[in-house]
């Protein structure tokens, strides 16, 4: 079965990549469908986002990256995909995604939505959070693939923070009178 994982991916995060990698194991093919949404103002062009995702998914044999405009259900029908893959971080995501799944079902009866709970380490992560951290010069190296982190630092004209390893202090020894 073919699954579509739609989104704006501006930028792709390690949370997105986690869903893609898990989808790769579950489905015959996963199409990461990068949405061209005229109502959004992405920092990266559509072509740049597609290239970023292709670079960080090249190790996944069943993943294809493409862009689309219009309704996700129309795109799924064109690509013979029967599943929309969605990640859920928190309860509010579920409410929004469930409503969207019902709406998509009214648009095309043959589409199903499969929800994957995000891994714990990514439950707080969103593209908006990543952009905010990068904008103010914080490190996003642990939140996005390396190529995307470099692109973010260039976009915001900040230098990647130099993170030094933590200082290990010797454990104090108890004072023993002798």
Swiss-Prot record:
Reactions listed under catalytic activity: (R)-4'-phosphopantetheine + ATP + H(+) = 3'-dephospho-CoA + diphosphate
Q: Which cofactor does it need?
A: Mg(2+)
Query: Its GO biological process terms?
Result: coenzyme A biosynthetic process
Question: Transmembrane stretches, by residue range?
Answer: none
| Gene Ontology MF annotations | ATP binding; pantetheine-phosphate adenylyltransferase activity
Q: Which Pfam families match?
A: CTP_transf_like
Q: Which residues bind ATP?
A: 8-9, 16, 87-89, 97, 122-128
The listed locations are: Cytoplasm
Give UniProt keywords alphabetically. ATP-binding, Coenzyme A biosynthesis, Cytoplasm, Magnesium, Nucleotide-binding, Nucleotidyltransferase, Transferase
Q: Which family does it belong to?
A: Belongs to the bacterial CoaD family.
What's this protein's function?
Reversibly transfers an adenylyl group from ATP to 4'-phosphopantetheine, yielding dephospho-CoA (dPCoA) and pyrophosphate.
What protein name is recorded for this chain? Phosphopantetheine adenylyltransferase
Name the source organism.
Picosynechococcus sp. (strain ATCC 27264 / PCC 7002 / PR-6) (Agmenellum quadruplicatum)
The upper taxonomy is: Bacteria, Bacillati, Cyanobacteriota, Cyanophyceae, Oscillatoriophycideae
């Amino acid at each position: 079965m073919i699954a579509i994982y739609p989104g704006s991916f501006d930028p792709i995060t390690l949370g997105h990549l986690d869903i893609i990698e898990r989808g790769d194991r579950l489905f015959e093919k996963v199409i990461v469908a990068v949405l061209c949404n005229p109502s959004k103002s992405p920092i990266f062009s559509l072509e740049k986002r597609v290239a970023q995702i292709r670079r960080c998914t090249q190790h996944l044999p069943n993943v294809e990256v493409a862009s689309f405009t219009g309704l996700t259900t129309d795109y799924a029908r064109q690509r013979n995909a029967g599943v929309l893959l969605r990640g859920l971080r928190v309860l509010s995501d579920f409410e929004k995604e469930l409503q969207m799944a019902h709406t998509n079902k009214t648009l095309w009866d043959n589409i199903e939505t499969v929800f994957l709970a995000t891994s714990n380490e990514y439950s707080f992560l969103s593209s908006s959070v990543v952009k905010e951290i990068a904008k103010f010069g914080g490190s996003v190296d642990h939140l996005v693939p390396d190529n995307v982190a470099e692109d973010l630092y260039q976009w915001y004209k900040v230098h990647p923070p130099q993170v030094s390893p933590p200082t290990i202090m010797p454990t104090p020894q108890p004072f023993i009178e002798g």
